Amino acid sequence: MATKQKMNTLSIIIPVYNEGNTVHLILEKIKKVVLPENIEKEIIIVDDASTDDTVSCIQAYCKTNDTLKIRIAYHKKNKGKGAALHTGIALATGEYIIIQDADLEYDPKEYLILLQPVLDGFADVVYGSRFMGGNAHRVLFFWHTVGNKFLTTLSNMFTNLNLTDMETCYKLFDAKMLKSLNLKEERFGFEPEVTAKISKIPKVRIYEVGISYYGRTYQEGKKINWKDGFRALFCIVRYNVLR
């Protein structure tokens, strides 16, 4: 029988790069989320050397919302999403860590869905899948979907997991487990690397839940491209076979 998990603080890591148009909006969405069981929110924003007004937008938001627990870290040079996550993971003090993009593609209201398997005592890690469940999904790029499913299937073959969405942003981790991993990938290779390494932890309990997805186009600011897909392919082999 599963034992209920006690959680005091959820660390929310937000890597940002040139998200001046949306960063204040995602922070407002997070602010409105009421977590169960009096869990506190620790928001960690890592600016990856933005060249727009992202930093000033963050600072302005913090001044008018000083009751929120927000920590900000700055990279002097652009290193990539993975590097920003490494910085955020090192700063996190909560028992659990969730990853949140600043682009409004993922809805913070669904933290409750991801948290439930943990709070019920069943899970150490929870992935939010865009390909399961009955929630809303914006209809976009066919080949992105094909590529995502291919990478997920290939990753599953090596990890012996049955994930439906390895590349999802929404990943919730036991902080001690995540911090124990020697993560190296500084860009979008973070997803296959962390999946490969977390799957190797003895007796780790990984769950998946369905989430909504409000994808954006490249004109709207989407950053991932075909080169990142090839890097993900390399990382699946590197961290599962070459090690």
Regions found by a protein language model. Name each.
Residues 75-91, 96, 108-188, 214-233:
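Acceptor/aglycone-binding surface of glycosyltransferases and processive sugar-polymer synthases
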Residues 19-22, 50, 81, 107:
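Donor nucleotide-sugar binding loop of glycosyltransferases
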Residues 47-56, 104:
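A conserved acidic beta->alpha catalytic loop
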Residues 26, 54, 85, 109-111, ...:
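Acidic donor-diphosphate engagement hotspot in glycosyltransferases and nucleotidyltransferases
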Residues 1-32, 38-39:
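N-proximal low-complexity "stem/linker" segments adjacent to membrane-targeting elements
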Residues 1-9, 158-160, 184-243:
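Hydrophobic helical membrane-anchoring modules
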Residues 41-44, 55-91:
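Conserved donor nucleotide-binding strand/loop of the catalytic core
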Residues 95-103:
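Short beta-strand-to-loop acidic/aromatic patch adjacent to the donor-nucleotide binding site
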